Regions:
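Asp-based, Mg2+/Mn2+-dependent phosphohydrolase catalytic module
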Residues: 5-25, 38-142
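Short, solvent-exposed loop/turn segments at secondary-structure junctions
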Residues: 1-2
Length: 142
C-alpha cells in the first residue's frame, strides 16, 4: 500500500496533467480507499462504497470533514444475484479497465463502460453522452 505522501504526489501529478491541457481544469473531489483487498471493506472495488460516497457528496447531504476520514458505510448491501438497480441519473456511468470497476458500477446501478487501459475515457466519450447507450454488458457472477 502507498502512504499518504505518495497518494498526494500521484494526485498532484494528475492535477498538473489536467492543467497542462486546460488551465481551468480541476478535480471536484479525490476519494481514496486506504484498505488492502483482504480487508474486505465497503469502499474497495467491486464494492460500491466510494461511488455511494461520491453520490452523497454531490447529490445529497455532504458529510462533514471528520466523517470523511472514518470508515465508509457501504449503505445497502449488494446482492449480486439480483437484477442491476436503477441509476440515480441516466448519465451516471462507471468507466474502467478492470472487472472490479465494472462490478462497482453494476452494484451502484450505473452504466458500465469497459475500456482498454491505454485508450481510456476518450474511447467511450460519445457513448457516455448518449443516454440511449446502456453501456457494456456485465455479469457479476462470472
Amino acid at each position: 500500500l502507498w502512504g499518504v505522501d505518495r497518494i498526494h504526489q500521484i494526485h498532484d501529478a494528475m492535477r498538473q496533467m489536467l492543467l497542462d491541457v486546460d488551465k481551468d481544469a480541476h478535480f471536484d473531489a479525490v476519494l481514496v480507499c486506504p484498505h488492502r483487498h483482504r480487508d474486505r471493506c465497503q469502499c474497495r472495488k467491486p464494492m460500491p462504497g466510494m461511488l455511494r460516497l461520491g453520490e452523497q457528496l454531490f447529490r445529497g447531504e455532504a458529510p462533514t470533514q471528520s466523517q470523511l476520514v472514518v470508515e465508509i458505510d457501504g449503505g445497502a448491501k449488494v446482492n449480486w444475484w439480483n437484477d442491476k438497480i436503477e441509476p440515480s441519473h441516466p448519465l451516471d456511468a462507471m468507466i474502467g479497465d478492470r472487472d472490479s470497476d465494472m462490478g462497482a458500477g453494476w452494484a451502484q446501478g450505473v452504466r458500465c463502460f469497459k475500456v482498454n487501459w491505454n485508450l481510456g475515457l476518450a474511447s467511450v466519450t460519445e457513448r457516455i453522452l448518449d443516454q440511449k447507450d446502456k453501456g457494456d454488458p456485465f455479469n457479476p457472477l462470472r
